[in-house]
């Protein structure tokens, strides 16, 4: 810059423009509905549209669906839902926008005058715009269909049940099922494919007990980056001895109700590819898969590293904790695939085993609660629940909202089936 004054001035001009733009877009007096959010041009333009819309007119905007999914967007949604008339969500699989990736979602939104009563229509999982017209005129006959048709192609067929009319009661349903009732009038707008799904959600809403109502611990055990730096574990593929607390699980090890789904190869380099599927019919009774990690600290220190439940007090009044690693726990894959065969994947992990943060586990004070949750979370009902949410990661708050506590008349069958698997 010292040698080229013109280049310096050009840089300074760009810097001033960028800083001023960011300051303007993040100023609360300019965009009060976006306070507490990560702003972007789409959100700012959407707020401008709501402010400038003529009471007798309508405004249409195409934008990403982030505002409907942002946990910090409750204030924005509370105003938006009162002005929203139509929300049509697309998945770009037909490449209507060739410059963005095929899995990106976006929506067309029609905004009108402020309406004190919530009342708008929504269609999700659209691939072509002509499906909208068909849904509006359909007579309701026949089956609605899913995301794909019987030939495995993306379903562009219209059906009356694809059209969801949202009012105060339906938004409260979403709030109760997915957000513990904390945002009655402005919950996140999850992807509801058809009206039939709302009936299923009503059943889930009516479930009386949840994980949060039971004594439990949720943990990731060891962070894949932090734990090696702290000298707790190291990356090394080897055959573990469970009795010596050698087994450390990661995501690919487990599948639905199966902690022995895959084993890493002796040379495991590529995270999700260097694994072989385990044939459960061929392995011996004492077989166990390899692990990619080796513990570096003494057994007693390792066992007590993650605190369990309080078991009493010592002579000085200090609390005595159990060892979490010594519990049976239910391990979940932390990363969830919304397009895979199953989204919610979990299995009961044996005592004396741990895992890295690619797995998130829960243990209960009462061991039967662990079996209860294992059975429920292996079901297609809970898998449907997570697919409806559309989340890519399983967070503790979401796990705490899972239904739990099966009626006694079903327990015997559920427990025997779950433990047999």
Where are these regions (language model features)?
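S-adenosyl-L-methionine
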Residues: 1-421
